[in-house]
């Protein structure tokens, strides 16, 4: 799978936060998450 660009990654974070956590992320929270995961989708096989 290709890496997401930052804009797509941020939109996806917003979607997940709203749908799963029922929460809005602040810009700082989004930057922090992006700094950890970058644009890479999380691979569940690595656990």
Swiss-Prot record:
InterPro entries: ATPase_dom (IPR011579). GO terms for molecular function: ATP binding. Belongs to the archaeal ATPase family. This is Putative uncharacterized protein MJ0820.
């Amino acid at each position: 799978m290709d890496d997401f660009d930052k804009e797509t990654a941020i939109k996806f974070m917003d979607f997940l936060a709203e749908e799963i956590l029922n929460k809005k992320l602040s810009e700082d929270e989004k930057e922090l998450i992006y700094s950890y995961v970058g644009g890479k989708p999380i691979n569940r096989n690595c656990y």
